[in-house]
Swiss-Prot record:
Belongs to the UPF0161 family. This is Putative membrane protein insertion efficiency factor. The lineage of its organism: Bacteria, Pseudomonadati, Campylobacterota, Epsilonproteobacteria, Campylobacterales. Transmembrane segments: none annotated. It comes from Campylobacter hominis (strain ATCC BAA-381 / DSM 21671 / CCUG 45161 / LMG 19568 / NCTC 13146 / CH001A). PANTHER family: MEMBRANE PROTEIN INSERTION EFFICIENCY FACTOR-RELATED (PTHR33383:SF1).
């Protein structure tokens, strides 16, 4: 079910959003916010957070920066150093115990 919603959002971002003017009052945009929610949270939690975000995205609210908040259990491991060439796609910034803000990492331009 999550994959269906994510596919619809990606379709919207790729084909519909470029035709419309920029109107989202928040950063990241509502569609990007909902993609992160569906990627890292349960279906119902992500759906509820997305609906609330879309309802807040209007002239009656200030807008601003509103990163998605996700629950993660991070395993603490001993430091193992090895060379790897993987790129960082998301940063998880601690907020409360077990909750993190999801911040997307952008590609570095040369």
């Amino acid at each position: 079910m999550k994959n269906i919603f994510m596919a619809v959002i990606e379709f919207y971002q790729r084909f519909i959003s470029p035709v419309l003017p920029n109107s989202c009052r928040y950063y990241p945009s509502c569609s990007e916010y909902s993609l992160h929610e569906f990627k890292f949270n349960s279906f119902f939690g992500a759906f509820f957070a997305t609906v609330l975000r879309i309802l807040r995205c209007n002239p009656l609210f200030r807008g601003g920066i509103d990163y998605p908040l996700v629950r993660l259990k991070i395993q603490h491991q001993k430091a193992i150093f090895k060379i790897c060439r993987s790129e960082v796609k998301f940063w998880f910034v601690p907020c409360k115990s077990g909750k993190f803000y999801v911040i997307k990492s952008f590609k570095k331009e040369k």
